[in-house]
Amino acid sequence: MSEVKRKLATILAADCVGFSKHMETQEEKTLLSLKDCRDIIDPVINKFSGRIFHTAGDSIIAEFDSPVRATNAAIEFQNVIKERNSLEQTNPKLNWRVGIHLDDIIIEGDNVYGNGVNIA
């Protein structure tokens, strides 16, 4: 068995608040809102040298080499989404909760594993 590759990294986990409830009542409009939010979040994560390594529905998990970069990315995309929500007239206003955690992680290919991912 090969040696496990580890490194210290900051994990950012973002999740849309009440996404399932929005989908129950306004499925298509909620999906459009989610796409709008991802069009905001993804480039901001990239701007701060983050790497999205997992998405599922309304959740995003990204790896950063710095807690400061992860925090700044979260603050920036939250502010832009807040502005988007203030202007949105027809589609649901989606809010995002974010967890950030610095820990030793296991890297296997493009995937990241470990307790640090779970905590974030």
Outline where the language-model segments fall.
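Catalytic beta-strand-to-alpha-helix segment of the class III nucleotidyl cyclase homology domain
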Residues: 39-42, 61-120
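Catalytic NTP-binding/metal-coordinating core of nucleotidyl cyclase/transferase enzymes
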Residues: 1-73, 79-80
